[in-house]
Amino acid sequence: MSGSTVPAGAVVPEAHTIETFQPPREMLQNHPSKPHLANFEEYQKLYKQSITEPNVFWAERARELLSWSKDFQTVHSGSLANGDNAWFVEGELNASYNCVDRHAHKDPNRVAIIYEADEPGQGRNVTYGELLREVSKLAHVLTNLGVRKGDTVAIYLPMIPEAIVAMLACTRIGAIHSVVFAGFSSDSLRDRVVDAQSKVVITTDEGKRGGKLIGTKKIVDEALQQCPDVRNVLVYKRTGADISMTPGRDLWWHEEVEKYPAYYTPVAMASEDPLFLLYTSGSTGKPKGVAHSTGGYLLGAAMTGKYVFDIHDGDRYFCGGDVGWITGHTYVLYAPLLLGVSTVVFEGTPAYPNFSRYWDIIEEHKVTQFYVAPTALRLLKRAGDHHVRNEMKHLRVLGSVGEPIAAEVWKWYYDVVGKGRAQICDTYWQTETGSNVITPLAGVTPTKPGSASFPFFGIEPALVDPVTGEEIHGNDVEGVLAFKQPWPSMARTVWGAHKRYMETYLHVYKGYYFTGDGAARDHEGFYWIRGRVDDVVNVSGHRLSTAEIEAALIEHHSIAEAAVVGVADELTGQAVNAFVAVKEGTQINDALRKEFVLQVRRSIGPFAAPKAIYIVPDLPKTRSGKIMRRILRKIVAGEEDQLGDITTLSDPSVVAKIIDVVHAQRQ
C-alpha cells in the first residue's frame, strides 16, 4: 500500500490509498528466459540516457533492432518548434524485409500469423516462408497495376491474414498504405480515398464479424461513385458471395497473384519516406491523414514490443485491435513481426459465439501477451467470471489500450484473467505517437491500477498550465500533457496539410508536442491520464475530469459502463450529465438513480454530483470501442439534428434509444 490516509489537496487522491503491484513473482519464475531489463533501476538509468543523450541511445537501438540496407550518419535533425523532425537521415531500409525476409531466411517454417476466423475452428496458420511468397506475389500485382513508390493504396479489409499481406506488399514496393477500417461507411471511405489520392483499393467480397456478414465490396462500390481517379479494385474472395464486378476496374486477388513469381526484390526506402497514412476520426470536420515515416516508426514498434510487452523468441502475441486503427498497425502487424514472433489475427468479436472467445483463443494458441481495450474488458467483466474458465498459464503480459482502465476493471483483469501471474500494462499513446509513450515495462515496472505509470524511452513528459502555457514542475500536480523532445515514431505531418499538423500538435504550446489530454503526476511520480482536455466539465469553478466521474460511477455494483458529459447550466456554468448502462437484471427506479448520484458525491465530492442520470441500454461507441461523448453532448443540448455521421458507430440504432430515454425523463 502507498499509505491509506489522503493528504488534503492531493491531486491524485486514489494514488495514496491504492495498492502498488510489483511484477508478479510467478511471471518471473515461469519466464522462458528473463525480462530484457534486470530491474526498475536499469530502466531509470537507460531512460536518463535516452533523454540526455538521445542520439547515442537511439542510434544503438536502431542498429540492433532493424536491418538497414544503407547505414545512417545523422541520428536526428530538426525540432518540435519547426515541425521538421527527421531520424536516421541517410539510412535506407525496407519494412517488409524487416518484418518478413530476415525471419523467413532464418526459419521459413516459423509461424508468422495465427489466423483465428470469425467461426471457431476455421482459421489457419501462415509461416514466415509462406508470408514472404504471398507478400511478393501481391507486390508484383500492385506494380503491374501501375502502383509506384510514393503512391498511396487504400486498404478496406477485415481482420484476415490478407490485410497484413496487403500492407506489407505496399511497403515492399515503396507504396504508402492507407488502411480504412472495414466498418466505416461509404462516405467515410470516399473521403479517405479522395484525400489520400489512392488509385487502387483492396477489399473483400464480404466480411464476417460476430456471425454477421458485412458487404465490404458493396460499400466500396458506393464510395467509388465519387472517386473517378480510382483505376482498380482488387477483391479477395472471403465468403464467395455473388457480387458485382466492374469490368476493366475490378480484379480478383486469387486470379491476379497466380500470374506472378514468389519473390519480389524489396525496394530500398529512405528512413524518412512515408510508410503509411492513417486517418484519425473524421467525426468532426475533415479527417486527418496522419503520416508516419519508415525508420522511426518501425523502431518505435520494435522497441515497445520488446520492452513494454517483454517479447521473446517463440512468443505468441495476441492484440485484439483491428488493423483499421493504429493499435492494429503497431501491435498486430509491426511490433510482433519485426521481432519475428507469431501474431494472432482475430476476425471476430469477444462475444461470438460466446463470451469465452478471447480466453479460448489464448488457451488454444498458448498466447503469451494479450492486448485489448477496456471497453472489451468491461463487456467481459459484465458477462460474468464463469466465462473465464481457462487456465491460460502461458500468459505473461496483459495490456490495455485506448483509454484509462478503471481500477476495478484493472483488478478483475489481474485476478480473474491473469490469476495474479501476468503483469498488467496500461499503455498510453495515440495514432500520432506511433507507439506506446507512457507505459509500464512488463517484468520491470511497479504499477498502480488506473495509472499508465512512467514514460517510455525518449519521451520527456511535461504537465503544462493550460492558462499560462508554463510547465508545472514537481510531483502531486496536474495539467495538460505535452512532450518536450521529439522521438523516432512520432507522426511527421498531416497528409497534404502540414499547417494543420503544426497548429494541432506543435503550436498549441510552442516547443512542445501537445497531446490534447490532461494528466496528473502523483506524489511518487506515476502518471495518471485524465482524458481529453475537452472532456473536462467546469462546474462552479471546479474543473472535473469526465473520466474521473465515470470511474466513480462504475464503482457501483449495478453499473457496467458510464459516459459523462458537460451540459450548459444557468447556475453553475456547466452541469454533469451521466449516461449509464446497468448490468442485466438490475431494477431501474428513482432510488437507484439517487444511489448513483450518492456514489459520485462519496467518491469525488458533492460538486461532482451528476445533475441528471440517464439509464440507457448501451452507449454510442465506434467500432474500435471509443465512447462517442460528442453524440451524447449533442443529445443533451437538444441538437439531435446535428449528430453528424453515426454510421461509424458499432451500433447506430442505439442513438435513437438514447434520445427516447432523454425525452422521456425530461417530460
Swiss-Prot record:
Primary enzyme class: ligase
Range of residues in the leader sequence: none
Keyword Ribosomal protein: no
Domain of life: Eukaryota
A GO BP entry: acetyl-CoA biosynthetic process
Induction of expression: By acetate.
One Gene Ontology term of the molecular function aspect: acetate-CoA ligase activity
Pfam families assigned: ACAS_N, AMP-binding, AMP-binding_C
InterPro entries: Ac_CoA_lig, ACAS_N, AMP-bd_C, AMP-bd_C_sf, AMP-binding_CS, AMP-dep_synth/lig_dom, ANL_N_sf
Binding site for ATP: 402-404, 426-431, 517, 532, 543
Enzyme Commission code: 6.2.1.1
GO cellular component terms given for this protein: cytosol; nucleus
Alphabetized UniProt keyword annotations: ATP-binding, Ligase, Nucleotide-binding
Known catalytic reactions: acetate + ATP + CoA = acetyl-CoA + AMP + diphosphate
Binding site for CoA: 209-212, 327, 540, 601
Family: Belongs to the ATP-dependent AMP-binding enzyme family.
Name of the protein this chain belongs to: Acetyl-coenzyme A synthetase
Upper classification of the organism: Eukaryota, Fungi, Dikarya, Ascomycota, Pezizomycotina
